[in-house]
Structure formats: C-alpha cells, structure tokens
Amino acid sequence: MNNYKSDFLNHINERGFIYQISDSDKLDKLFSEEKITAYIGFDCTAPNLHIGSLMQILLLKKLQDFGHTPIVLIGGATSKIGDPSLKDKSRKILSYEDINNNVKGIKKVFEKFLDINKIKIIDNSKWLEELNYIDFLREIGSHFSVNRMLSFDSVKQRLEREQNLSFLEFNYMILQGYDFYKLNTDYNCILQMGGSDQWGNIICGIDLSRRLAGKELFGLTTPLLTTSSGQKMGKTEEGAIWLNFISEKDNHSTHPRDFWNYWRDKTESDDVGKFLRLFTDMPLSEIYEIEKLKNEDIEKGKELLATKITELVHGKDSDWKSKKRIVFKKKEFEKGYGLLSLLSHNDLGLAK
C-alpha cells in the first residue's frame, strides 16, 4: 500500500478508495499544499442512484470533510447519448422529459450525503447544448486520436466481442473530456474522480486540457464495487439496489428492509472488512478484529455492516429494523429455539 504525504490521499487509500492516479506524486504534493477542486460526473439514466454510485458519493463527502471543494457534475446532456464504458450493448435512448425528471430525482440523493451549501452542482447542458457542431469538430475533435480512443477498454472490449458501438456512443468520451476542460477553465477544477471504468474518459480530458491550454490536470479512479469472487454488487433478480426510498411501488426504489437484507445476504465473508472500510467510519483497528472472525462468527460482521450502511443511507430512524428478515444459525435451528429466545436474538420484543 502506498504512503501519501497528504491527509486526504492517505485517508482514502487506507479506506480502499484508490485504484489508479494519473500522477500520484504531483497530486499528493498539491493536496499537501493547497485546497483543490475536484469533480465526479453522474449520468441521469434513472430518477435515483444505485449503490454502485455510493462509493463515488462518499468520496465527494470525504473531499468536502478534508476542506476541499467537490463538484457534482450532472450529465443532463451526455445522458442523451449514453456512456458505453464496459457495457455489453448500447443504452436505451431516453426522452428529454425523462432526463429532466431524472436530474431532479438524483439531486435529492446528494442532499442526503453532502452539505449542499458547500458544493457545486452543475449540469453539463450548460455548455454542451450551446456547441456548434462544426466549430466543435474543428476546435476540439482535432485534438483526439481515434487510434488511441480505440485502445481504451471501454471501446476495445465492445469491438473484440463484435458488439455494435454507435457513432453516438463513440462521441461520449470526447464530450466527457470537454467537460473536464470546461470545469477547469470555469471553476479551476484540476481533478476528475470516478470508477475504474472511467479511466479512458478521464485521460481524454487530461490530454485535451494539456493540448488546448497547457494545463496539467489529474485523474483518480476507485475500484468497481465487486465481491471477492468477482461479482458486481448492486443488482438482484428484481433489479438495482437504490439509494433513495421513494415508495414500494416505485421501480426505482428499494425499501430500507430490503436494503439491509441485501447487504446481510450478498456480502461475502472475505469482503466484510473491505466494505466496512469503504462505507463506515469505524476505526481500522476495530475492522481488523472483525476480519479475524471465521465461519459462523463472521455472520455477525455481516449484520454489523448491513446495519451501519443502512443507517448511513436511510438513517437510524427508518423502519428497516422492525422488518428485517429473522436470521439465526443452522445449529441453533437444529437444537430447537424457543419463541422468546428467537425474538430476543433478533432484537424483537412482545408488546404488553
């Protein structure tokens, strides 16, 4: 594990947030010497964000907690195209009305985690929808190498599988690169952060700013949210696990009790420590002790994780506690379990 001089990079590294940094020594020096502005982009493909975005939101929160300035970039314009990064097929093209409604919905997610008065929430429609196509091709497109774009995993994997990649999607990384350039020009933003699948798009923005303005910008990516066995976290047979609870009838909503059960049931034993580092503020010394637990004892660690992350997302006052699934060990079931013991074991009680 790398040791960083800056408090911010050292902290997020210890908690497992760092996958790649474009120039770690220079960025570490900047974080040590000054307050910087960084951004993460979120597309508006749904009126809610799922747990795959939680790591990015918490990264912005940590940036804010360490006194730096986070920017949330809403992809009001790029959502009309769709990001092809590590996707097997083209995204469904949404109507403009759906995208506008989605923008309103996901802004509510950020309000739960971030101090809205101390961050900037910017929609890239502000500049992308004003572009003249011919001028954009001449002034921006001329700085992009198709040869290099074809080498990025987000494109290469689709082509290797002989899956269609539309010209519309191929333009996505150019627009995202331009986003980074504009945020640097208008807001002095020097760092783009995102999941590891965004590396190619981030590099495009770094290269563009160097060519257009001679500026040195930086990129930082996080690992994708996967289990030790390589399974992506965030979806079930019923659909995605969403961060905002809207209603049980809403297709883009997950009830807090189902949210708790998801983390309790889907977390693999080897991942309890990793997820506690990412999604809680528990001291590392306590997490190390939990990681030592084996076999059935680690199940208590899974329940602790489920509780901590549900309280983070839905609050301690949500009704998930009274509706979580009753869980007890197989050997306890085989030897028999009294009703009162069962209720006590699961923090339930009888009304008088």
Regions found by a protein language model. Name each.
Residues 1-198, 202-206, 213-218, 231:
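NTP-dependent nucleotidyl-transfer catalytic core
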Residues 208-352:
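Conserved nucleotide- and phosphate/pyrophosphate-binding catalytic cores
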